[in-house]
Amino acid sequence: MALNEQDVARIARLARIELTPDQRSRAQDELNGILHLIERLQAADTEGVEPLAHPLSAHQDIALRLRPDAVTETPSEDRRAELLANAPDARDGLFLVPKVIE
């Protein structure tokens, strides 16, 4: 599967980003490269290969360098107010963002 210029223009419109002709051409090349890689991965024979929880776990000599899932700071109203003060628009303790899906 390969994307043409119209496909890239449609993707850009859906993502609501404006691309110059040069950017559109580069995006087309990059997206087609990604799709080619995906096709190669899908063609790989994985029959009998057990799924991995993480790709690094395939290597015995490499320890997983994943950080523990631990709370690093306690939530507070002061911190919440500080974060919301940086938002362009906030109401009732929530960030307000423009509608992006029609």
UniProtKB/Swiss-Prot annotation:
SUPFAM superfamilies: Glu-tRNAGln amidotransferase C subunit. The keyword Plastid does not apply. Disulfide bonds: none annotated. Its EC number is 6.3.5.-. GO terms for molecular function: asparaginyl-tRNA synthase (glutamine-hydrolyzing) activity; ATP binding; glutaminyl-tRNA synthase (glutamine-hydrolyzing) activity. GO terms for biological process: glutaminyl-tRNAGln biosynthesis via transamidation; regulation of translational fidelity; translation. It catalyses: L-glutamyl-tRNA(Gln) + L-glutamine + ATP + H2O = L-glutaminyl-tRNA(Gln) + L-glutamate + ADP + phosphate + H(+); L-aspartyl-tRNA(Asn) + L-glutamine + ATP + H2O = L-asparaginyl-tRNA(Asn) + L-glutamate + ADP + phosphate + 2 H(+). It holds the Pfam family GatC. Keywords: ATP-binding, Ligase, Nucleotide-binding, Protein biosynthesis. InterPro entries: Asp/Glu-ADT_sf_sub_c (IPR036113), GatC (IPR003837). Gene3D superfamilies: Glu-tRNAGln amidotransferase C subunit, N-terminal domain. Belongs to the GatC family. Heterotrimer of A, B and C subunits. Allows the formation of correctly charged Asn-tRNA(Asn) or Gln-tRNA(Gln) through the transamidation of misacylated Asp-tRNA(Asn) or Glu-tRNA(Gln) in organisms which lack either or both of asparaginyl-tRNA or glutaminyl-tRNA synthetases. The reaction takes place in the presence of glutamine and ATP through an activated phospho-Asp-tRNA(Asn) or phospho-Glu-tRNA(Gln). This is Aspartyl/glutamyl-tRNA(Asn/Gln) amidotransferase subunit C. The lineage of its organism: Bacteria, Pseudomonadati, Pseudomonadota, Betaproteobacteria, Burkholderiales.
